[in-house]
Amino acid sequence: MRGAGQQPIIVLSQGTKRESGHQVQIGNINACKTIADVIRTSLGPRAMLKMLMDPMGGIVMTNDGNAILREITVKHPAAKSMIEIARTQDEETGDGTTSVIILAGEVMAHAQTYLEQKTHPTLIIKAYRQALEDMIQWSENKFSKTVDITDDAEIAKVVKSCLGTKMISKWMDLAVNISIQAVKTIRVEKAGVREIDIKRYCRIEKIPGGRIEDSQVVKGIVVNKDILHAKMRRRIENPRIVLLDCNLEYKKGESQTSLEIMREEDISAILEQEEQAIRKQCDEIIKLKPDLVFTEKGISDLAQHFLLKAGITCLRRLKKTDNNRLARVCGARVVHDTSDLRDEDVGTKAQLFEVVKIADEYYTYVTAETTTACTVVLRGPSKDVINEVERNLQDSLHVVRNIMINPKLVPGGGALEMALSREIEQQGAKMDGVKKWPYKAIGLALEVIPRTLIQNCGGSTIRKMTELRAIHAQNAENWTFGVDGTSGDLVDMNKLEIWDPLAVRIQVLKTAIETSVMLLRIDDIVSGTKKAVGGEKQEMMPQ
């Protein structure tokens, strides 16, 4: 760049790389298409599995979109944002991770045509936003039905359509029952608002060995811990429980101190002082007559001795999350210092404490009939199988939660996408100006979902898609027609009982289009200098 005196003005440093204009947009579109192509075959009941090696040398086998992309290392910033949307989709709704990536890739691919025709990105974005608003409105008002959330059989149908594409589909009824039971256990109504916090109050405990059919929901908590002393009780009915967040051992000073001891009896006095401090802590606990003490920190041998003499069973080094879940089960309050313990801090709601040996490990069960925290115990032949079953179960738990919070359903199997595509086609025909073309392009992009389902079944894509378009165009009542993902035939989803939660599909549409809009607005990528490596790094270090 030159100023008035023809002197070059350097704005960016030499190591900085800059790409701008049309080249950047095409690069972003290609990155999105590449990511979409990676997991295109992982959509639907006939989905292929991907085998991935993680950096630690472990193997992941899955067809879960988010799990696949999480293991892939990419350089391109647009590809990174695509991986991010799969994670967002998984956290928000637990399902639709593969769909959202495929749809975003297709929406970006359709934008390329208009960018090459020199259409301004702002016009494309405006049309995309308009299409998104219309689609959300149609999905909620035209193409959805409400489900009765008190009827488990109705919810089960929806969960089955979600799990049909997963590995756990062979144990469908078991997975459905576990999901519904777990979500109903942790459901809490506060001031008319329904709260279902799966992450915090529903833990999945994986125990290798046994059969998948042995998996169950435990109303309470299960932790991989054993009692500290062989003479402590392993089974207590209706226990009084104290939960602590402090050490039951002598507190060491903050700074390093040294003592000079001149007489022998001084050592005894110091040791006596340590013992007194621990005895005081234990007496404060024993005063409340608990049966069980759980702490997040350590318990010294001396403290174990005092508690054992008082007939108290204790466990140490619990995770904070487990302690909070335990507080919900037994009604106790987590106390940070033994001197603050009051009678109301003791939990009495738990009905049974039991230490059980499963395979070579000991597991502690604390259960109650009426509780708002639960643990799903998963069994299976190997670690890989259990990990995949856990991923599938997480998805089905989220599906049940979504239905409980928003009981509206839309047809699966690409039926909703085809119905929306037809509406966009009709609405686009009434529009005028340049905006109508990108608007109608969204309708074409939506067809990627049923098309991919047909492809993954090995069906004839062109013939089936033409047939499906004809069915939807023939009669407005045919909005429930879609693709049977197992056989590749065109079926009424109402008869096949394949329904998705509205929240999932709307989130897919929102995330895919909003990401495309964000990426289309990028016209410049400036990448800074990379860190110096090897010899250069050593040279730069101060002498």
UniProtKB/Swiss-Prot annotation:
Residues making up the signal peptide according to the UniProt record: none
Entry keyword set: ATP-binding, Chaperone, Cytoplasm, Microtubule, Nucleotide-binding
Localization per Swiss-Prot or TrEMBL: Cytoplasm
Classification via Pfam families: Cpn60_TCP1
InterPro entries xrefs: Chap_CCT_gamma, Chaperone_TCP-1, Chaperonin_TCP-1_CS, Cpn60/GroEL/TCP-1, GroEL-like_apical_dom_sf, GROEL-like_equatorial_sf, TCP-1-like_intermed_sf, TCP-1_chaperonin
Disulfide bonds: none
Gene Ontology molecular function, alphabetical: ATP binding; ATP hydrolysis activity; ATP-dependent protein folding chaperone; unfolded protein binding
An individual GO BP term: protein folding
Deleted gene: phenotype: RNAi-mediated knockdown results in severely reduced microtubule growth rate.
Functional summary from the UniProt entry: Molecular chaperone; assists the folding of proteins upon ATP hydrolysis. Known to play a role, in vitro, in the folding of actin and tubulin. Plays a role in microtubule polymerization.
Family designation: Belongs to the TCP-1 chaperonin family.
Protein name per its UniProtKB record: T-complex protein 1 subunit gamma
Species per Swiss-Prot/TrEMBL record: Caenorhabditis elegans
Source taxonomy: Eukaryota, Metazoa, Ecdysozoa, Nematoda, Chromadorea
